[in-house]
């Protein structure tokens, strides 16, 4: 549904405008003291309505292309949506503590596996 601009199996769930608003950075530039972690809300990552948004891949420090959005949950679970490459990823694990490189590794391996001309970094 998120990848298809609010439509799932031919049924409109959310308007395209709602999806655009969800993906749009709602926070803007934040001073370093207001940032949640050293990764979240840096100059390349914003926060939309429900997930982190990649505003600039080069500044984000993440392997996700500009325009992608993502979020994680407890024990290392996470998902991401990459509209440019028409790709979604869902990673389910139960790893405590989850401060590992699994997310970066998964993103890197995914994009490395699809190295043909379809991938637009």
Q: Which role fits each region the language model picked out?
A:
Residues 1-121:
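Catalytic loop of the DD-peptidase/beta-lactamase superfamily, centered on the K-T-G motif
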């Amino acid at each position: 549904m998120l990848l298809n601009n609010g439509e799932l199996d031919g049924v409109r769930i959310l308007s395209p405008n709602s999806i655009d608003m969800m993906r749009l950075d709602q926070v803007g530039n934040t001073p370093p003291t207001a940032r949640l972690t050293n990764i979240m809300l840096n100059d390349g990552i914003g926060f939309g309505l429900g997930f982190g948004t990649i505003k600039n891949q080069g500044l984000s420090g993440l392997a996700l292309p500009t325009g992608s959005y993502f979020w994680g949950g407890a024990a290392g679970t996470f998902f991401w949506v990459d509209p440019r490459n028409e790709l979604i990823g869902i990673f389910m694990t139960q790893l405590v503590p989850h401060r590992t490189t699994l997310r970066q590794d998964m993103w890197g391996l995914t994009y490395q596996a699809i190295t043909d001309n379809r991938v637009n970094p």
